[in-house]
Amino acid sequence: MSSSLGKEKDSKEKDPKVPSAKEREKEAKASGGFGKESKEKEPKTKGKDAKDGKKESSAAQPGVAFSVDNTIKRPNPALGTRKKSSNAEVTKELNKCREENSMRLDLSKRSIHILPPSVKELTQLTELYLYSNKLQSLPAEVGCLVNLMTLALSENSLTSLPDSLDNLKKLRMLDLRHNKLREIPSVVYRLDSLTTLYLRFNRITAVEKDVRNLPRLSTLSIRENKIKQLPAEIGELCNLITLDVAHNQLEHLPKEIGNCTQITNLDLQHNELLDLPDTIGNLSSLNRLGLRYNRLSAIPRSLAKCSALEELNLENNNISTLPESLLSSLVKLNSLTLARNCFQLYPVGGPSQFSTIYSLNMEHNRINKIPFGIFSRAKVLSKLNMKDNQLTSLPLDFGTWTSMVELNLATNQLTKIPEDVSGLVSLEVLILSNNLLKKLPHGLGNLRKLRELDLEENKLESLPNEIAYLKDLQKLVLTNNQLTTLPRGIGHLTNLTHLGLGENLLTHLPEEIGTLENLEELYLNDNPNLHSLPFELALCSKLSIMSIENCPLSHLPPQIVAGGPSFIIQFLKMQGPYRAMV
């Protein structure tokens, strides 16, 4: 008797490497919880129309690493609808703006096809928002708005801009994201007061040498285009703080990039970079460097001079080693992602290289050993992801990792967990799925802060009674093991919301399961020896997902099973000693 009332997700997919970074981008999954890529933010609008914005979807894959934009956020859409404005209505808005002498006009999300030429009369405007319309061109009259400082044109169908815009001598922010530009309009290079320029998600193939004419530029975002190279003149942008060239087709960077010494955020992820210039070491203000999903095989030693660096993401390249003592030189580094590379050993440099690291992700490499003492100075290390490596054991000083909060050791070849796991008193998340564990240490019960314990796909035949001490546990995954029984102490886990017991050899469930008052998801599927459910299960009033497929539950009528958890609980109440609760 079976029921498809809910299944646990399989999180064990591996992401094979292939030569092309673009192909790897499609296949590889991001590391959960480590180094997520964030969305580029939107320009802010104010006033009564501020709820009519539109959220921009992220082109990035799941996890981690980061977007380096330092932008301002635009409003959320009102009820997800687009305002439809006739020409008369738009003209009315323009007239109102003129009469009230408003300095700000928001015509975003109005399905506007053509902006009336009468806009030229609004010479007092300093902010004009036209994003998320259907504009294919701008009237030349926009060039009359000589006081304009902000012009937001994202999410239209613009293919060019009128030359008259070069009259906008005060323009500081220009947003052209999500249009149909095949090149950066020549007039843009003449807007020498620009400090912020957004060109994300167009069809731009090149940045011209004329970019040197934008000396005040502090933020330049040209991610998600088709740019194959940057001109040497990019090095003349001495005020540049944020440079986002992610999701393009770059193979090299000009050495002149080293002249942009004010850069703090540099996002180069999802390109085809084969190397980095030594001059990158000149970026003494660099705070975040995103290089994930490229084709790098080495990192220049000069990067050690970027002493302000806090986040370094090298995920999914072809790197097998780092320059010796590189990490020790990066004295402010707190987040390091080396996932999906070719490391067989930990980076050379000794314990001091991890003294400032908060999060270390080395998922999907070929490491077979964590060196003894490597984390002896890692007093702030809270997140360690060693998923999908070749570990067969853990170091003898494993129990000294007292600052660890999240530890992922999934998809290795571990046969045992040391008893001194009891020393990891700060641990909240422990992932041990897809290993070769036959039993768990009694010291596990000392992890009183544990919220999530994942032991899926091991060879466990029983659980220690000490598991009853994990009273903060919310998620316990024991799927695909060899369990025949559960300890009665399972009933002490009253904060449990998710319990995965599918694909085991359970013969029964303890009646104490009825004390799991917060249980919402229970997976019992594929237990061939489970013939009945305890009446106490009826006490789990919050249960909303229950999988019992491929279990020979002969006492449950098929129509009850088909009705889902609420029917099953009702049936157990009627048939058992809890019928008074019906």
UniProtKB/Swiss-Prot annotation:
Domain of life: Eukaryota
Pfam families: LRR_14, LRR_8
Record PROSITE patterns: LRR (PS51450)
Keyword Nucleus attached: yes
LRR repeats: 101-122, 124-145, 147-169, 170-191, 193-215, 216-237, 239-260, 262-283, 285-307, 308-329, 332-353, 356-377, 380-400, 403-424, 426-448, 449-470, 472-494, 495-516, 518-540, 542-563
Lineage per the UniProt record: Eukaryota, Metazoa, Chordata, Craniata, Vertebrata
Record's protein name: Leucine-rich repeat protein SHOC-2
Gene encoding the protein: Shoc2
Primary residence: cytoplasm
Subunit structure and binding partners: Component of the SHOC2-MRAS-PP1c (SMP) complex consisting of SHOC2, GTP-bound M-Ras/MRAS and the catalytic subunit of protein phosphatase 1 (either PPP1CA, PPP1CB or PPP1CC). SHOC2 and PP1c preferably bind M-Ras/MRAS, but they also bind K-Ras/KRAS, N-Ras/NRAS and H-Ras/HRAS; these interactions are GTP-dependent and both SHOC2 and PP1c are required to form a stable complex. Interacts with PP1c in the absence of Ras GTPases. Interacts with M-Ras/MRAS and RAF1. Interacts with ERBIN; disrupts the interaction with RAF1 and Ras, preventing the activation of the Ras signaling pathway.
Keyword vocabulary terms for this entry: Cytoplasm, Leucine-rich repeat, Nucleus, Repeat
UniProt free text on domains: Contains a N-terminal RVxF motif that is important for interaction with PP1c.
Region listing for Disordered, in residue ranges: 1-90
Classification via InterPro entries: Leu-rich_rpt, Leu-rich_rpt_typical-subtyp, LRR_dom_sf, LRR_domain-containing, LRR_R13L4/SHOC2-like
GO terms under biological process: cellular response to growth hormone stimulus; cyclic-GMP-AMP transmembrane import across plasma membrane; intracellular signal transduction; negative regulation of neural precursor cell proliferation; negative regulation of neuron differentiation; nerve growth factor signaling pathway; positive regulation of neuron differentiation; positive regulation of neuron projection development
Function noted in UniProt: Core component of the SHOC2-MRAS-PP1c (SMP) holophosphatase complex that regulates activation of the MAPK pathway. Acts as a scaffolding protein in the SMP complex. The SMP complex specifically dephosphorylates the inhibitory phosphorylation at 'Ser-259' of RAF1 kinase, 'Ser-365' of BRAF kinase and 'Ser-214' of ARAF kinase, stimulating their kinase activities. The SMP complex enhances the dephosphorylation activity and substrate specificity of PP1c.
Molecular functions per Gene Ontology: protein phosphatase 1 binding; protein phosphatase binding; volume-sensitive anion channel activity
Family under the similarity heading: Belongs to the SHOC2 family.
Record motif RVxF motif, residues: 63-66
Compartment(s) of residence: Cytoplasm; Nucleus
Basic and acidic residues composition bias: residue spans: 1-29, 36-57
